[in-house]
Amino acid sequence: FNKAHEKGIKILLDLVPGHTSDQCEWFIESQKPEKNEFSNRYTWTDSVWEAPPQYKFVCGITNRDGNYLVNFFSSQPALNYGFAEITHPNWQLPPSHPDCQATVEAMKDVMRFWLDKGADGFRVDMADSLVKNEDGEKPETCKVWRNIRKMLDEEYPEAAIISEWSRPHTSIGAGFHSDF
């Protein structure tokens, strides 16, 4: 970062807030059968036999009695920011649930880590996809980003965030500086 900054170059990192690798320590802890602080960091069903067809789940490969939601590939478990519409109350949580809020705080910590190292901001992958079961203007996902933007404005006012959203009128209102 220092060499780039010496040359007047700003560095934006690619932030992927919707999922992690299945090798991430958060996920390794989350897949344990015993409840722990990471149990709800990802979205899990309550039984290995439950996998509603409207979602993409990986089934029966962990010690936990449940299946985990993915955004794309089996190696990319989806982080749990909650569900705007609860259709399966035994395992879906609202965005206001403390465990979903803990996911937001963890993502802020990831951002702080890189900003403290010298990054100048982030290009955010799939920024509109955090809260599940949400259509239209995505008000719950917008709340998440406004919360993150508040932290950035207070702690890193020079940091830039650019969304991959493809709806500038929504993403700018959610706190992004630009959208593509």
Regions found by a protein language model. Name each.
Residues 21-129, 143-180:
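Alpha-amylase-like alpha-glycosidases and glucanotransferases acting on alpha-linked glucans and related
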